[in-house]
Amino acid sequence: MADGSDLENNHKPELDRSQPGSTSNGSQEQKDPDEIAPEYATGVRLILVMFTIFVSTILVSLEIGIIATAIPGITNEFRRLDDVGWYGSATFILAAAASPLWGKLFKYVDVKWTYLSAVFIFLVGSIVAAAAPNSVSVIIGRAIQGWGASGVLGGTLIVINYVAPPRNHPLLIGTWMAVFMVSTILGPVIGGGFTSGVSWRWCFWINLPVGGPIIVLLLLFLRIPKHIKKVPATWQEIILALDLPGFCLLLVSLVCLTLALQWGGQTKAWNDGSVIATLVMWIVLSIAFLVTEWFQGQRAMTPFSILTLRMTWSNALFCLISYAALYQVMFYLPIYFQSIHGQSAVKSGVNTLPFLAFFALGAVVSGGVIGKTRYTQPFELLGALIMTAGMALIYILDVDSPQAMYIGAEVLFGFGVGICNQIPMTAVQGFSKQEDVSSATGIMVMCQTLSGAYFVAIAQSLFANRMLATVLSGAGHLDPALVLGTGASELQHVFSGEDLTEVIAAYMVGIKDVFAFSLACAAFAVLLSLIIPFKRLPDHGKKDKPATEEAAEEKSEAEGKVSGDKEENHS
């Protein structure tokens, strides 16, 4: 049996298929008898497959946002205010840690059955959360949902790459991103309807009657083309390739960070021993994770052979930071509407529709244009610039800002982030070798969900600390636990008079700090877009050159240029 560390090298095809006419020994063009011409889904079958996986995305993304308006019902039943932060973060933590594992599974195991497994795990998590007898069970259910959700999201993007004609990838990924974002933001509106009209448990039960037909449709219509072959490996080799030590280190480090941010300044002082200990553990475990990844080589969750490519790491960073800017607006713009303007969850959802509409427009337009031009970097720069301008307008919103002002701000921000948000996935998939697509997709989905796990927790800590400090300085007689435990849409009912004025002012201070953080992330994304290589996506009428070979060509060209300069100087 081959050593697991050489797993990928042991199964490389002898013929270098990225360069027609060449073999491993440099001979003239030969026809590989094992090579199968690509056969992609088209017409009705392509529509049915895309419809099914997009509905899967809707199911998963609704659960990301739906918890926001389900929390009041959960806390009313279980009386565990100290668990509130975990209802949302448990999903992000498991999704972030598990994404690279799913990428490896899609590489070594049948894509169809792996995707079905992810949907099934998500539905199991929904059942656990819906039937939860206590708060801990809700958290466990949400964590299982996150585990399955990461497989569904990554699997959807892999299926698009494998099943759809390559020329359609940018448009389909842009459409997928629009579907994902619209569903995520509509989640709180739907969750509010279930929580107030029936029960918070229906926020999770509703997944079953939708998930069942999805599984049936996947069984009927999902067919992976024959030219897409899984990497042959034994189960022992697959288990080694999953990098379970790296998974555990990343998972525990995220838990430590979340604990520290939820304790610090809210239930415990920042200089409390337990807060300091969890922060130290987060740093130590994060370093241990990076060291483990380095020594794992090709078995790593995030293989450095893929991650160290400039096309990959620059787009991964852009993805991480642009999502940080996006998530804060997604979660805190509705809080702004509900707390500052006294709107209901439904009304605040309606007021985010302009953001959703222009996000979807930007995503579809940029996907279509990139499909024609084959260039990605200019649109990442353009989108980041528009996103930053929109974020600056959102930052200056205040307690008395008129409707025209906040709608204009969210329209500009939504259009900008829609243009650039899905491009990193398109670029990384487009420049990856076929056998690396699943691992590269896992890395990018990890960046998306890590952004939620890290930056949403940081923003929540920033908001809560600043808001409480402002309340205590202006209305010291108020109970901090009451202020924290009162939902944004309930402030008008719980507080009145001067107390209400002070609480609203404190909310505005906390929200502004979060928006400032988001503005900094958007501006940083502009800088990151300048680092991304200016390259045309491979032409699909020819054999595509993977990123690794393009990197080798760049190095060869650079060496040739230096050599030529030396000869000129010598002469």
From Swiss-Prot:
PROSITE patterns, sorted: MFS
Gene Ontology MF term list: transmembrane transporter activity
Subcellular location, principal: membrane
Stretches for region Disordered: 1-34, 538-571
Residues with attached carbohydrate: 25
Transmembrane segments: 47-67, 86-106, 120-140, 143-163, 171-191, 202-222, 238-258, 275-295, 317-337, 350-370, 379-399, 405-425, 443-463, 514-534
Membrane association type: Multi-pass membrane protein
Alphabetical UniProt keywords: Cell membrane, Glycoprotein, Membrane, Transmembrane, Transmembrane helix, Transport
Domain of life: Eukaryota
Record bears the keyword Glycoprotein: yes
Pfam families: MFS_1
Residue ranges with Polar residues bias: 19-28
Localization per Swiss-Prot or TrEMBL: Cell membrane
GO cellular component: plasma membrane
Compositional bias (Basic and acidic residues): 8-17
PANTHER family xref list: MAJOR FACILITATOR SUPERFAMILY, MAJOR FACILITATOR SUPERFAMILY (MFS) PROFILE DOMAIN-CONTAINING PROTEIN-RELATED
Role summary: Efflux pump that is probably involved in the export of dehydrocurvularin.
Name of the protein described by the UniProt record: Dehydrocurvularin exporter
Upper taxonomic lineage: Eukaryota, Fungi, Dikarya, Ascomycota, Pezizomycotina
Gene: curE
